[in-house]
Amino acid sequence: MKSALTALLVFAAAPALAQPAAAPPPVPAQLPFSPAVPAGGLLFLSGQIGQVPEGMDRHTDGFDAAVKGAMDAIGAILTSNGLDYGDIVKCTVMLADMTDWPRFNAAYLPYFKGKRLPARSAFGANGLALGAPLEVECIAALR
């Protein structure tokens, strides 16, 4: 009986644990994902591509703008969930061109000034969403 009750409580609580996190509206409603989902004491953020503004070249002025766009979108999702960059425990970085890795690092580091750097992986990816030059996906610890 005790194990059946425990199973029932876990089953009943599971939908509440998997509810999408509150977030600003940067992701259009027709896209098939949530900006972030809390589970197991963590907040899993969807990848952010940081759109390059029209008329900018991705590999000159546009790349830095894309990094800023992605990291600012991550910051907005964190803020809407009562968190900040210091709560990030892991980031995965996908770059369309691995020669942009030093430029990415230079633009990424200021977001963690005075904070612990999260664990991170980075790899080259052929064909990111919407032709983006990068995508950044993070996991944050909930408070």
PLM features: residue spans?
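N-terminal presequence-like segments and the immediate start of the first folded domain
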Residues: 2-90, 94-143
